[in-house]
Amino acid sequence: MIFRSELKFLSIVVLFLSFFELSHAQDFQGKAIYQTKTTMDLGDWGGREMSEQQRKQIMERMKSFLEKTFILNFNKTESIYKEDEKLAAPGSGGGWGGFASSFTGGPQYKNVKNQELLQEQEFFGKRFLIKDELKKLDWKMTSETKQIGQYMCFKAIAIKEVDEFDWRSMRRRNTDEQKKNEKEVDTTNTKTVVEDIEIPKTIEIVAWYTPQIPVNQGPGEYWGLPGLILEVNADKTTILCTKIVLNPAEREEIIVPSKGQEITQEEYNKTIKQKMEEMREMYGGRNRGR
């Protein structure tokens, strides 16, 4: 018991010294590489009737959207998070891949000092610049720890409201009422796949952060913890840091995004909703004309 207590004390001392040294660095900067992966059950999208070979082919085509590599460049107050251009795959042809490629996310800038968020976003060929306030999650910090690479990480949990157009949490409606209605075939039904989609209102976020890197930054929209966030588990998506370089010899300037029509997140969501309504009317009209 004494040995364990001494080890715990030494760990705290090491973390404190690391925090003190880095937090007093004048031009502290870092670079983190993150791998993201989103799982998708094709059974939720009519995949139960597909052969195993068909499922494999579709998942291979979807891989460029479900698995990505991102780079986070950060300092004490700012960060820029963007997809690794060397590994970014071109959008695929039709189907879900073609639809998903219509939502192209650009660099995301966070300024924790000014509570500012900026992100370049392209939607059906039109470029937008989303400008909004940073949304901070109500993190519940725990004493649970684990090692990620050479860093001791602590667990934090939060409940997050899901954006109504976050495709990573989309799933097909599968209520008991719907199952009951499936027995009654309606030949006049023109409901589209989009109308069959639902998104949960909230999801649980589990984050692992390290006080050894004392910046309250993290991948994507995640931030606000007393240390860099190295791992995030959000519903069907996992984000994991695979490499960190602190104070690199060749520093990369954090450039604030500036391209596109300036718009708030709420206004951007309204634009998407309007476009999807147009698509529903267009495809619904085709179905009724058959």
Tell where the protein language model's regions lie, with residue ranges.
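Bacterial Sec-dependent N-terminal signal peptides
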Residues: 1-34, 288-289
